[in-house]
Amino acid sequence: SHSLLKKLKKQSDYYNFNKPTVGSFFRDVNTRGLSATIADRKMWAEMKMNPTDLADVSGYTYTYLMNGQAPLKNWTGLFRPGEKIRLRFINGSAMTYFDIRIPGLKMTVVAADGQYVNPVTVDEFRIAVAETYDVIVEPQGEAYTIFAQSMDRTGYARGTLATREGLSAAVPPLDPRPLLTMEDMGMG
């Protein structure tokens, strides 16, 4: 909306609620030493960024959807045990990257952005804005959670593959929030 953009134009990290703190400074001094910690903080300050600057707007502001459904609505896709299912993941977000997994199921990636690829079996994959991935899964149990957590770990979209309506599987916790390094910024 207009107010989001207005706030970001005034302060680019307005919605970053996970900035480095005095506590993280002392933790870094303990693990990396004083001079390395100061040098690292100085480099980030010169770029007017910080290592938690993964997304301009995050799950603190947005609700991430799967097939138009919020996580609590739990979109459900039905299957028969042993059936091969092709799932197409489309990242329709404006700026969010997602890490997608289906706990308990391997996914075989068969297409990327509409182009067939040599099949690759994965536990998880990252999808950028406007990308699509087609995967094949072969569920055997009753219910599996499709879990798409934002790269900055502030929220997720979720759905369920199930043998019948009303079933759901456990929703995994968000992974720990990653920190950017100078190498991530092309400065290493």
Residue ranges and their predicted role:
Residues 142-171:
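Terminal connector regions
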Residues 92-95, 139-142, 152:
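Short, charged beta-turn/beta-strand-edge "cap" motif at the junction between a beta-strand
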Residues 1-129, 135-136, 165-187:
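Histidine-centered copper-binding motifs that mark active-site loops
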